Design a protein with these regions (language model features):
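Hydrophobic alpha-helical transmembrane segments
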Residues: 16-21, 45, 49, 61-69, ...
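Interfacial aromatic-anchored transmembrane helix boundaries in multi-pass membrane proteins
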Residues: 30-40, 71-101
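Juxtamembrane membrane-interface segments at transmembrane alpha-helix termini
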Residues: 53-59, 77-85, 100-107, 127-132
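Membrane-helix interfacial "entry" motifs
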Residues: 3-7, 11, 15, 36, ...
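Membrane-embedded alpha-helical hairpins and interfacial helices in multi-pass inner-membrane proteins
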Residues: 108-177
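Alpha-helical transmembrane segments of multipass membrane proteins
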Residues: 22, 26-30, 51, 71, ...
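Hydrophobic transmembrane alpha-helices
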Residues: 2-57, 62
């Protein structure tokens, strides 16, 4: 009975702890996998994939915000990015957007097309936050030198790939959860 009690956002404590694990994984993977591909958005394949997977496994409203909030706080504490404390929003906004768009797809994130669409959309939301923070803080934005069009396409492709991979993982893991 205790595990069925709602803790936050109508999610159980066990679900919030699982989401915290996913959020931690996002920040740690971003810090550990610094692959110098020099392609904008290449980390979205991991990052957006984990967000979509967490939302697919625990579909309640707020799960994206919990994962985004946890990874954002860890990103600030680990000193990820050149935005200072504002790096939090790069992690939080994709989770918020995922919470807003998942109901439009009836939470069917185990469908590879839906997973890819959600991954692409939240990856683009991260790119827009990067752009807004760069303009607001007057940071050098290398991704603008190669063009916003290419940057948008690469974010879309990597986010979609992460979302599609997450869809297959959701199908495998959901029965075990």
């Amino acid at each position: 009975a205790a595990s069925a009690e709602k803790f936050m956002f109508k999610l159980s404590l066990a679900d919030v702890l699982r989401l915290t694990m996913f959020g931690t994984l996002i920040a740690l993977l971003k810090d550990i996998t610094r692959i110098p591909l020099h392609i904008p958005g290449h980390s979205s394949i991991f990052w957006m994939g984990i967000l979509v997977m967490g939302k697919g496994l625990i579909p309640g409203f707020g799960s994206g915000m919990v994962m985004g909030g946890v990874s954002g706080v860890l990103a600030v504490l680990l000193g990820l990015g050149k935005e200072g404390v504002f790096v939090f929003f790069k992690y939080f906004i994709p989770g918020l957007v995922l919470d807003l768009i998942a109901p439009l797809f009836l939470y069917k994130l185990e469908n590879p097309v839906v997973g890819a669409l959600c991954g692409a959309i939240i990856s683009l939301s991260k790119m827009l936050v990067n752009l807004a923070l760069g303009l607001l803080l007057k940071l050098p934005m290398v991704f603008l030198t190669i063009g916003l069009g290419f940057t948008s396409i690469s974010h879309t492709l990597f986010g979609a790939a992460g979302g599609a991979i997450a869809a297959f993982l959701i199908k495998r893991l959901k029965p075990r959860l």
